[in-house]
C-alpha cells in the first residue's frame, strides 16, 4: 500500500547511485539533528507554555489556542503539545529539518553530492541569534520552520502535479497541495503574508504565460488565501486577548512614527542579517571568482562595486560574529542601518546580475528575499527569528545559482578564509589571555 502511494506521488523507491548518496546525506543529517534537538534546552516562551499554562485536557488546549489573541492556531497548539514531551519534540524537529533539507535538494535540483553536502552545511549556518531563536527555541521552530516545511511541500506537490498524467495521482497531489498550503498560513504573520502573495504570483504568472491556469495552481492559491483569511480574521471573530496580543505586530499611526520605526527596524534587520556569516562569505567568494571574467563584462564598474560590497559585508560579518555584537554605542544603530542599506543594494545588484546571465530562478528568489524584509520595517516588535525566512530564501538563491565547478573553487577559497580567520582568532585569544594575566597580576599586587 505504501509503495503504491509513493508511486502515485511520483517518487521512485528504487534509487540510482546519486539518490543513494543523497539518502546517506539525509540519514546523516537526520541523526545529527536528532542528537542536537534532544540536547537543546527549553528557553524563553517554551518555559511559559510548559509551566505557565495549565492544560489538563483537549478542551483547555483548544480554548487557550483559539482565544489567545493571534491567528497562530497550529503554531501555538503544537508548541503546547511538544514542550510536554521531550522525545516527541526532538523527533518531530529532526524529521522536519531533514524533510526541508530533502525538499531543497529536490526543488533546487541539486544532483551532485558536493552540492547536496554544501546545502546541508549552509542550512546550519544562520546567524547565532537566528539559530538560538529558531532552531533551539521550540516556539520559534514551530512558528517559523514548520510553515516553511509545509509550503515547500505544497510547492513540491504542485510541481509534481505538472508532470502527472494519471487522474488518481493528480487527485492525490491536489489534496496534498491543499492540506499543506492552507495549514502553512496558521503559524506566523510574515510567513502568511509572503506565502499568500507568492501563491497569487504563481497563479498570475501562469495566466500571463499560458493564458490559462491549471487546477493544481487554483488549489494552491485557494488554500493559501483561505489559510491567510483564517489567520487574519480568526482573532477578530473570536475576540480573544489572553496574551497581550492587541499591540503585537502593529503599524504606527503617525507618519513620523512610521519613519522612526523604519529606521529602528532597518537597523535591527541590518544587525540580524549581518550575523549570517556563511551566506555573506560564500557570496563574496563567488563574486571574487567572477572577477576573472571582468574583461568580458560590459558593466565592469557595477561588478566591481558589487564585489567590494560583498567583501565588505563578509568582513563586517566576521567582525560582528567575533566582537561587534557586544559593542554598545549610542550611534551603533546608524552603522547597522547603513549596513542594511548596503545589504539591500547588494542583493538587488545580485538579482539583476542573475537575470543578465540567465539564472532567472535565482534572480526571483533573491528578489523574494528582499520583499520579505519590507513589511517588517513598519511593524513592531521585530526580532532575529522574523528574518529567518529572508535568510532561507537567499540561501535557496545561492544554492540555485552556484555550479559544481564554482563550488569546488569556492571551497578552496573558503579553506583559505577559515585558515586566516583561525589565525586571527588565535591571536585575539592569546592577546586576551595576556591582558587577563596582567589584570590578575595587578589585582594580586593591589
Language model features: what each stretch is:
Residues 1-33:
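Start-transfer (signal-anchor) and selected internal transmembrane alpha helices
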Residues 35-84, 88, 182, 189-197, ...:
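Transmembrane catalytic cores of multi-pass membrane glycosyltransferases
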Residues 72, 121-159, 188, 328-347, ...:
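Membrane-interface micro-motifs in multi-pass membrane enzymes
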Residues 94-115, 153:
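Transmembrane-helix motifs of polytopic, lipid-linked glycan transferases
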Residues 102-106, 153-160, 198-207, 281-287, ...:
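Transmembrane alpha-helices and membrane-interface helical segments
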Residues 160-182, 215-219, 410-413:
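Short hydrophobic alpha-helices at membrane interfaces in multi-pass membrane enzymes
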Residues 304-311, 352-370, 405-429:
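Signature aromatic-anchored transmembrane alpha helix within multi-pass, membrane-resident enzymes
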